[in-house]
Amino acid sequence: MYVAVKGGEKAIDAAHALQESRRRGDTDLPELSVAQIEQQLNLAVDRVMTEGGIADRELAALALKQASGDNVEAIFLLRAYRTTLAKLAVSEPLDTTGMRLERRISAVYKDIPGGQLLGPTYDYTHRLLDFTLLANGEAPTLTTADSEQQPSPHVFSLLARQGLAKFEEDSGAQPDDITRTPPVYPCSRSSRLQQLMRGDEGYLLALAYSTQRGYGRNHPFAGEIRSGYIDVSIVPEELGFAVNVGELLMTECEMVNGFIDPPGEPPHFTRGYGLVFGMSERKAMAMALVDRALQAPEYGEHATGPAQDEEFVLAHADNVEAAGFVSHLKLPHYVDFQAELELLKRLQQEQNHG
């Protein structure tokens, strides 16, 4: 007979103590500091900030430490903390054209105004384990040079000026805020992009990959990927003019997608857009690919792949929600299982006597 069992508070406290001990690890080894995580695991910090919805490197590093390096748990911690924060102001729209560039590449033009900047990247490495890191070797040395950044307009703006793409203009409508109003489907472009930015990187990467394998009409080129620092400004009510309050390291991706030939308009390329905190380049590219796939209805395209189904994609992109729903299966379901068990036994008895 299956009966309900109550877990004791002492057992739960002991489980938490065990987890804390595992998180700390061998006490003979130096403890990993939040500053070390922030500086040396910077790409993990970038992901937690992006999907956690807070652009604070120290808090993201703290969440990673507390979560024993579990990205999804760290994102959950950051989301929970975010709910306690007051909304003090709304920043002015970010101007990525004025980005202080750390990296900028284009796969469609070799020579672009402002030039290409390779920047920090794992591209072109051989993906061989570097065993010298086991010896806690010397810090790498860099040779730096001061140079003035040239104006670097977006590659898509160059295409638009040639009539090869459409300018995207601000409609003036108030953007949705998915942190205050739950999204409904079909949703606006602003809501869609917010959900994609906070969506799980692995999930979006898989969907983006599916569009490349034929599950969705998509023939992309990396028009431009740029990473760098963007000024953030607000307009205080008592002043009435914009005041710079800091800067953010962000990565922006614009994908040049297959052209369309709409009636009454010249044929032109379409685009997908991605924007993330830090240098999460893979996430930005995946976001841009899925963004374009979700624009299928706007271009009158027949949806042939899961990446083109807006509600399916966006309703399942949030890893905090997904992890929570899957994890709830670990909670006691004794009564539910007992009901199914009794039903199964009754069906078997009816079959045996039938």
UniProtKB/Swiss-Prot annotation:
InterPro entries: PhnI. GO terms for molecular function: alpha-D-ribose 1-methylphosphonate 5-triphosphate synthase activity. Keywords: Transferase. Its EC number is 2.7.8.37. GO terms for cellular component: alpha-D-ribose 1-methylphosphonate 5-triphosphate synthase complex; carbon phosphorus lyase complex. Coiled coil: none annotated. One of its GO terms (biological process) is organic phosphonate transport. It catalyses: methylphosphonate + ATP = alpha-D-ribose 1-methylphosphonate 5-triphosphate + adenine; ATP + H2O = D-ribose 5-triphosphate + adenine. It is an enzyme of class 2 (transferase). Pfam families: PhnI. Forms a complex with PhnG, PhnH, PhnJ and PhnK with the suggested composition PhnG(4)H(2)I(2)J(2)K. Belongs to the PhnI family. Together with PhnG, PhnH and PhnL is required for the transfer of the ribose triphosphate moiety from ATP to methyl phosphonate. PhnI alone has nucleosidase activity, catalyzing the hydrolysis of ATP or GTP forming alpha-D-ribose 5-triphosphate and adenine or guanine, respectively. The sequence shown is that of strain K12. This is Alpha-D-ribose 1-methylphosphonate 5-triphosphate synthase subunit PhnI. The lineage of its organism: Bacteria, Pseudomonadati, Pseudomonadota, Gammaproteobacteria, Enterobacterales. The gene is phnI.
